Amino acid sequence: MEKIILVDGNNLLFRSYYATAYSGNFMKNSKGFPTNALYGFTNMINKIINEECPTYMIVAFDKGKTFRHEKYEQYKDGRIEMPDELKVQFPLAKELLTNMGIKYYECDNYEADDIIGTFAKYCDEEEDFIGTIVSSDKDLLQLISHDVDIKLLKQKDYIRYNEKSFKEAYGIEPINIIDLKALMGDSSDNIPGVKGIGEKTALKLLHDYKTLNGVYDNLDKLTPKMREKLENDKDNAYMSYDLATIYKEVPMEISIPDIKLKNKNSDKLNEMYKELEFYSFLKKEEKKVDNNIEVKIIENTSEINVQKDSAYYLEILGTNYHSSKILGMAIYNEDNSFYIPFQILEKKHDFLDKLKYTYDYKKNYVALKKHNINILNTNFDTMIAGYLLEYNIKEDISYLANSFNYNIPFYDEMYLKNKSKSLYEEEDIKKTAKAALLKAKFIYETKNIFEEKLKEEKLLDLFEEIEMPLSKVLGDMEYNGVLIDQNELNKLGEEFKIKIELLEQSIYNDAGEKFNISSPKQLGEILFDKLQLPHGKKNKSGYSTSIDVLNKLLGKHPIIEKIIEYRTINKLYTTYVEGLKNAICRDGKIHTIYTQTLTRTGRLSSIEPNLQNIPIRNEYGALIRKAFIPSENGIIMSGDYSQIELRILSHMANIDSLKKAFYDNIDIHTKTASDIFKIPTDLVDKKMRRIAKAVNFGIIYGISSFGLSENLHIRPKEAKEFIDSYLQTYPGVKQYMDDTIKKAYEDGYVRTLFNRKRTIGELQNKNYMIRQSGERIALNTPIQGTSADIIKKAMIEIAKKLEQEKMQTKMIIQVHDELVFDVPNNEKEKIEKIIKDIMENVCELSVPLNVEIAYGKNWREAK
């Protein structure tokens, strides 16, 4: 028997799109092109082929209005118009299918269901064929027969129905799905059915009378009320029957031989996968790069011979390299290549000066330094180069390598089993050695390619002068770590627990009952059903109880303030008190990981644990910082740029009045309030300054009047007046914004003062809201990115100075505009001058950079 797979293409793409469209995981490639529907679609198509092993396959698509619209003009009325982000993915889905060797088809005046129905009928009539339909559309259940089954897709799986299992589930025959739709209607297709009859009632009628005709032939046996409903809507019922019936005689220009699976066009498929940045699919296609490599495993230190500049790759088991096991190192150049197991590597280091090129130098540097192995001559990191060139960089090198057609196993495939990240397979040294050597080969062979691209994109200086030197600086910060006062954390934890318990009891008293405060559903029922507080629209999961919703309810009931405080303290306790305690290493320190290749603006981020997210604007968050302490006989010192982004804005936009205020060391928010409210500075009150501050920083992020109104809890009209007044007061800012956005549209990207580049694909989108988002990115990136570049330069220069002066001071934390140091008491005065001098003079702008120095016996006091 030959198998035919019949796929509902529209259904698959819609499902894939909406699975992530509003979840925070909306996929785009680095150019901003939406890819979420395509990714899910491609994944499902591959899965179908692997599971079903068909000989024939057709993917059917809708093509505009059909004969059903002629019968009923309102057919499918009320459906939300297809989003532009989904619409643009349809042509590429069809192109992907063609390159996968799969036939797709669409036909004027007919739906995808009708095309599927026509081929399903063929399976029924021909003895040598069986069919499987793939869709989540229940309309297609009517096509189930002896020779046709259906995989009805669910959220994370599917249900397979054949004649027997369908009847067991529904109690009717598959063909009676048409009768069911005729009675109950279908809101998704705007099929009216009989008013007042739902699925449960319709199924009961069909159990008793089999068909729609059977129901109408037995009206006298029904209750008067039911009979009235059916009589009143008889025309609608029969029209609905016609609309729900899948047509099986579509006049198609293709036949069975045309839908036989063909060979893939791997070259074109790979090109598409690279363009879409579907690196996980690349590994499944044939590669152009030779995957064969001699696997030489070093057994004795005498065999190690490195005469030329080489690429290297450190194979590490685990994602947190502060505690992970090093398996070994692969070394590659055009003359020789070999793999050194770690127990051999530990014994010989005299060749390390030849190791010049790698992937994720910081990881290698820190992991080896923990074993007293110093690798200091690396000058090219492919991970950083790829990041600056806007490749989709991940921790696993295989994603980048596969985009260059290197067939390298992914980390998960190598070391994880059962998809559990805590269970590692036994190390197979030959497998490990080959994978590591292929990675080193990729690094070596593409080094010049990346270098040329960096030159072409005017990014080489940024790479060589900032990002590469910074990776070692960050490595030293991670290695040094920051000392934690565990007693202080424990004490704080106990205080938080007591406060949480008191708040819980007070909230229960206000609510009049006990409930799960952390459950949005239960909280929503208490606030909006029981206490009758104003609320938004209720959705399937209940009322929204987000912080934005709660903030709007402040002052309307005492319970609101307590809930906000409860959430704040509870998060601090679980995320920071307990989280930080779990992250403390044997040396009593926390060793975070600074990621250099994550944000599009160039800002650094911190993970495992995140030290940049510890709240400082509330009293409880500030208490967490008390636990960060210096080494013995030392202090914590902080150097913090004052209003650096506003200074960069005044430089870029060339605003004389703002520049003068910075030169005269006038409070910029008071100055702005004075200007926009047109009053002397001594008459500016706290509220005016707060508004001016919100506008100052909002302008940097391209804030809308609605956004400002939300921040300040004022009407959008009032917020618009503040923004308009600001832009009239500082016309240079408006000119700068207009010029920046215009140039971004022309070029497709923006740059920082140090040439960091960010491509903004959102500007090419047809959707107005997405283009607006792109414009905000265009305004913010040059400012925030320049700020990130400046502090990076300062970090490099400070690290150099500390080394030159042979000082014991250690740089231990970076939080956006702030650097934190562990300073011996006897170096306090000297290091304060060094930090301030370097941070303020590392970059020459038309306004002065100002750094505020603070110190104390813990991080909280150094603020």
Language-model regions, residue ranges each:
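Noncatalytic, basic helical substrate-engagement surface that gates or grips nucleic-acid strands
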Residues: 2-134, 140-160, 236-239, 245-253, ...
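Conserved RNase H-like, two-metal-ion catalytic cores of nucleic-acid enzymes
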Residues: 4, 15-50, 58, 73-74, ...
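Non-catalytic nucleic-acid-binding/docking modules located in mid-to-C-terminal regions
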Residues: 54-58, 91, 100-102, 125-128, ...
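Active-site-proximal helix-loop-helix substrate-binding element of RNase H-like nuclease domains
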Residues: 106, 160-181, 322-455, 466, ...
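Conserved "right-hand" nucleotidyltransferase catalytic core of DNA-directed polymerases
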Residues: 233-342, 355, 423-616, 635, ...
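Function-dense linear segments that define catalytic or interfacial modules
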Residues: 331-335, 388-419, 435-442, 596-680
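Conserved catalytic core of nucleic-acid polymerases
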Residues: 423-425, 479, 585, 591-592, ...
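C-terminal polymerase-core module
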Residues: 498-505, 509-561, 728-782, 826-863
